[in-house]
């Protein structure tokens, strides 16, 4: 979706899988300002774990502070994703709540399952929800872009 918004100054980030010989080993967060951070990896000996991944909550905190703090000139934030790993960071949750209650546009992917903040976002009456899967992702992206154009 970000490619379709070229020329617009974006806030937020997307998450990229880290693979070795075809096997997923971790996740890297890439902010639209160019900052990057490895937020989870199978080799991280962390207290916080989601599945087989150790989660670096401090890295998520730093990324949230930088990428999700509202800045003048940014009217649209893209966030991929609001998931279990990201929600281990209270700073991430706090910054997301600030964006959700603010005057900027926000498009985010939200984990299919999850309690706490994940469920809270899905219950919000001021949020539009689309179900995204591999089969419909191009059509849904076009629908969201049209929705944004009318805002």
Regions found by a protein language model. Give the residues of each.
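Short, flexible coil/linker segments at or flanking structured domains
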Residues: 1, 15-20, 43, 48, ...
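Phosphate-binding/switch loop-helix module in NTP-utilizing enzymes
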Residues: 47-93, 97-98
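N-terminal phosphate/diphosphate-binding loop that engages ATP/GTP or pyrophosphate donors
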Residues: 2-52
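Surface-exposed beta-strand edges and their flanking turn/coil or helix-capping segments
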Residues: 25-28, 40-44, 52-56, 100, ...
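Glycine-rich loops and low-complexity Gly/Arg-rich segments
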Residues: 35-40, 52-56, 102-105, 131-135
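Residue-level preference for the first positions of well-ordered beta-strands
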Residues: 11, 76, 105-107
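Short glycine/proline-enriched coil/turn segments at helix->beta-strand junctions
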Residues: 5-9, 73, 101-102
